[in-house]
A protein has these predicted regions:
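Sec/Tat signal peptide C-region and signal peptidase I cleavage site
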Residues: 17-22
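Short loop/turn motifs that connect adjacent beta-strands in outer-membrane beta-barrel proteins
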Residues: 23-24, 37-44, 56, 88-98, ...
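Surface-exposed strand-loop-strand hairpins of Gram-negative outer-membrane beta-barrel proteins
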Residues: 24-26, 54-79, 118-130, 172-173
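Outer membrane beta-barrel transmembrane domains
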Residues: 27, 66-67, 212-341
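Residues on the lipid-exposed face of transmembrane beta-strands in outer-membrane beta-barrel proteins
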Residues: 35-37, 49, 81-88, 139-144, ...
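Transmembrane beta-strands of outer-membrane beta-barrel proteins
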Residues: 45-47, 95-103, 152-158, 182, ...
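Transmembrane beta-strands of outer-membrane beta-barrel pores
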Residues: 51-57, 103-109, 160-166, 204-210, ...
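Residues that define the transmembrane beta-barrel architecture of outer-membrane proteins
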Residues: 74-80, 128-138, 176-182, 225-233, ...
Length: 341
């Protein structure tokens, strides 16, 4: 009886832990910022469309070592972010008010093949899930930016994540996270050279989370947990290069990276085969990636196109993979700038 019970618990643990660790991540998806992290949009309305692709085929333990060597599978998602900034043409507290909203659509999938759990068994277990649709909505109603002298642009803000994406505990077609989030963000760009061609950039995000409902992988029993708080840092060092002598076209190239850590423990309990297990026992996750960014800029037209690639070189208690980010932005300047003579 003891052996059978141990096998059952092991099976339940694998079936619940694999998707759990695959989902170990903050609401903030790293890779959104790199170069120009502190740059303030010109007064007017700025629209940006950002596509994010993340894929991974490796699951790590709390030491960063690959686990479940005989488990194969992939975890991937696409996010299409539609971001709108509004920047009034007047200063507040010496800076610019720059709120924005990001309405997101997502497509994701998780496929994992577990080996046979019982001696003599020829077949294993396949875990799979996937969905697409409206994802959670990111709103930053309070966001202020300042030009500090000629060398520094800085912004700081408060945002929240609304769980507008479809979520049902235990479902395999979830798109949203299933809980509210609160974020405090900052962005800094330091211009190393007087002509602002060379820059160092840093973006930070601290997020705290509300409660979410989770479901036991086997019995379907529900419980509530509070995901631990997370801190994300994104950085970049870049160089702008004129493509035309009149500076009407610019290229910007740089080294970029991100780091994300869980900084407080999870609250509440999971249910594993009906047995409460403290969510705080799940190890803290972290992930670190490095890559490059390339921008094409038309300053007079307010247009920027960009491409970023990150390879994650270290991940603990979560999946490890790679991130592609690409898209563009356009600013409708209000008032319209006077034509150059």
């Amino acid at each position: 009886m003891t052996i059978k019970y141990a096998i059952l618990v092991s099976a339940c643990f694998l079936a619940s832990t694999l998707p759990l660790l695959a989902q170990q991540k903050g609401q903030w998806v790293p890779g959104g910022f790199g170069l120009n992290a502190g740059v303030i949009p010109d007064p007017g309305i700025t629209y940006a469309n950002v596509a994010v692709n993340y894929s991974a085929d490796r699951l790590n333990n709390s030491n960063g070592d690959r686990i479940l060597q005989n488990v194969t599978g992939t975890y991937s998602f696409w996010v299409d972010e539609n971001i709108v900034y509004y920047v009034p043409n007047h200063k507040i507290l010496g800076g610019y008010f720059m709120p924005y909203i990001s309405i997101n659509a997502a497509t994701g999938s998780l496929v994992a093949d577990l080996p046979p759990l019982l001696p003599g068994s020829m077949s294993g277990i396949r875990l799979s899930g996937g969905a697409s649709g409206l994802a959670d909505t990111y709103v930053e109603p309070l966001n202020m930016g300042w030009h500090l002298g000629n060398r520094v642009d800085f912004n700081v803000g408060y945002a929240f994540v609304a769980p507008t994406g479809r979520y049902s505990a235990g479902a395999s077609d979830n798109v949203g996270s299933g809980y509210w989030g609160n974020n405090v963000t900052s962005g800094t760009t330091f211009y190393i050279t007087k002509n602002k061609g060379t820059s160092a950039n840093l973006f930070t995000d601290f997020e705290s989370h509300g409660q979410k409902t989770v479901s036991s992988a086997v019995s379907g029993q529900r419980s509530k947990i509070t995901p631990g708080q997370a801190f994300t840092m994104e950085w970049g060092i870049g160089q702008a290069l004129p493509l035309k002598k009149d500076l009407s076209q610019l290229a910007q190239l740089g080294l970029v990276g991100y780091d994300q850590w869980q900084v407080t423990s999870n609250g509440g309990n999971y249910l594993v085969a009906g047995i409460p297990v403290a969510a705080s026992q799940v190890p803290y996750y972290s992930v670190h990636g490095i890559g490059f960014q390339a921008n094409y800029i038309l300053p007079a037209k307010g247009v920027t196109l960009f491409f970023k690639y990150y390879d994650e070189y270290l991940a603990k208690a979560r999946i490890q993979g790679r991130t592609f980010v690409f898209g563009g932005s356009w600013t409708l300047r209000i008032p319209k700038p006077a034509p150059k003579k």
